[in-house]
């Protein structure tokens, strides 16, 4: 929050963010990971306090970041109100070996963000995603498994994501990216 006049502050605004995470465990079809996020600002914040869309595309092949838009370029979309939905369905382990335990996943990510009074921010053109941003993905968790102990291992995930918003043919690095993720298995 910012308070005009407090410590010579020039901006008055308040913000509220909500983040809900839930994992649904199904007997036959794996797990559904669900994350919903929303945020709202009152007043007129400075540019560095606006909500920045959680984007993680920095190239054609990059690191997978949970609960972020894999195909959205970083630091492009700004808002003072937003709603995001991240859903990932795992299908279960396809097979198990000492060095591989691949688990198919399907992902859908959606977001909407609106920037009111964008002209109040001088010196830069700010974009919002008020028409929505949608992407889908598929890949394998634990494609490579590196055992550390009998009950503990390091896993490497690989997935591809496509930006549905662009409605353009597949273009690696623009609307399609390949992501590599890392995690611990126990």
Predicted regions and their residues:
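Exposed, low-structure sequence patches enriched in small/polar residues
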Residues: 1-186
């Amino acid at each position: 929050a910012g308070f005009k006049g407090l410590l010579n502050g020039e901006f008055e605004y308040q913000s509220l963010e909500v983040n809900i995470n839930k994992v649904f465990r199904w007997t036959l079809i794996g797990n559904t990971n669900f994350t919903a996020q929303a945020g709202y600002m009152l007043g007129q914040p400075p540019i560095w306090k606006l909500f920045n869309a959680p984007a993680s595309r920095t190239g054609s092949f990059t690191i997978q970041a949970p609960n972020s838009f894999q195909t959205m370029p970083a630091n492009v979309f700004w808002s003072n109100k937003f709603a995001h939905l991240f859903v990932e369905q795992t299908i279960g382990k396809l097979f198990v070996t000492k060095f591989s335990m691949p688990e198919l996943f399907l992902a859908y990510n959606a977001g909407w963000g609106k920037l009111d009074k964008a002209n109040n921010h001088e010196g830069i053109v700010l974009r919002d995603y008020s028409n929505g941003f949608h992407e889908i993905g598929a890949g394998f968790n634990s494609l490579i498994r590196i055992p550390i102990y009998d009950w503990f291992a390091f896993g490497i995930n690989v997935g591809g994501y496509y930006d549905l918003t662009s409605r353009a043919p597949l273009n690696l690095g623009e609307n399609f990216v390949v992501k590599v993720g890392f995690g611990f298995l126990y």
